[in-house]
Amino acid sequence: MELDGRTIFHVDVNSAFLSWSALKLLEEDPGAVDLRTIPSGVGGDVKTRHGIITAKSIPAKKYGVQTGEPVVKALQKCPQLVLVPPDFETYRKYSRALMEILARYTPLIQQVSIDEAYMDLTDRIPFGDREGALALAKQIRDHVREQLGFTVNVGISVNKLLAKTASDFEKPDRTHTLYPEEVPAKMWPLPIGTLHGCGKSTAQKLQLIGINTIGEAAAADLTLLQSVLGQKSGAYIWNSANGISRSRVEPEREQAKSVSNERTLSEDITRDNYQTDGVPVICMLSEKVAGRMQKSGLTGQTVTLQVKSSDFERYSRQMSLPDMTDRASDIEAAALLLADKLLNGPDGLFESGISIRLIGVGVSRISEKQIHQMDLFEWANRNEEDENARRAEEKARRAEEKARRAEEEARRAEEEARLAAEKARKAEEEIRRAQEETKQRAKSARQARLDEMMNKVNSRYGSGTLKKGNKKDNNQDGN
């Protein structure tokens, strides 16, 4: 069957991290305020006023709070903003629960991040049965809301690209369609930066040549796009703008010699959004790899982190662990360390201005798990690993504290500059007053000398004589 004859859903959780944090708080205290109903956000620390916002509520959005901005800036916009720390363990729990529900409708599921997945429902919804597709989407939304307590958007189309775009339309708890004939009206008027797979740097390059909307990219000459973006990227943008995508929904498959997962990102990852968009994906992929290994009774020792750039070039780093493992925490720690070196290091991709469109995590040197009693030496090794992890966490904390102090020093420097400017203004004002007083004293002195001269004249000739003489002189001047 041709791809255009398929029925594809894209399911996306509304404000995932914020919703899941709210649900956890309500589980712990049913009388607690629902974070989704008040100005709130995930990330950072309200006491230290450092960190960034990784998720926000709809009420917080009304104050202009934005995902990815510093906490201190968000609190300036909304002083009553309630902040909670991220809890990836809770997020993984709700993510797994969501995927279990989706799996009841079809086995053809491709999870692309911790809070979104594609579903191929062609076998369940015959092509052309659009009313049936809408009804099933509502059923899925209701199922998730009633059983798990949060809401999702569902986008429907004939391919993954259009389904993903549709799910990003009005939120929350909505179903949207974007069939090929709807593309000109629904997708083409959108800003070019909203096109799936078009990152910030790509959008800026297109805007420089006058392409500001998706429709303008769709109507552009393909060779022009390729000359600006490169052969592969130019073709990708042109096809995407015209709603063309041949990417299939690809369920997870076990691999014999390694276990890996990779995800194409909804937008390019740069240094600016790595913490908010990149780290959660790496954590989710590590969890998925560990889950598959545990399910199959496997352990592994080499962790690989792989990325694909916006120009479709692949880069990877790998490291071997001291021991075989199937633990998500071990895989995640190694993957994050590799990502930090590959992306954020002095010679990292971000330093070179390269953005990332795909992330993959894998474990190799696989073997079947051996069940045995852990001896004293293994306990010592594990304790040493825990100590190393603690030290790494402490190092990260010190780095964050250093950044906070730098921010505070910058703030003090700014305040000192303001005070210096105020001092200079006051000095200038004092100089102006002194000049004014000098002028006034000079004027008074001149007046005093004039009065003294008048007094001398009057005392010598008499005041009446002077006035009469003046009158005579005036009459002479008038003749």
Regions picked out by a protein language model, each given a short descriptive name:
Residues M324-E408, R412-E415, L419-E422, K426-E437, ...:
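C-terminal hydrophobic structural anchor segments
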Residues V307, G362-S364, N475-N479:
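Amphipathic alpha-helical surface "interface" segments used
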Residues M1-Y236, E387-N479:
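Gly/Gly-Pro- and Ser/Thr-rich, intrinsically disordered tail segments characteristic of DNA damage-repair
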Residues N14-A16, V46-R49, S310-E313, I366-K369:
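Short, charged/polar surface micro-motifs in flexible loops or helix N-caps
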Residues E2-L3, H10, T194, T202-I356, ...:
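DNA-contacting surface of Y-family translesion DNA polymerases
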Residues L305, V361, G462:
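Hydrophobic, well-ordered secondary-structure elements that form the walls
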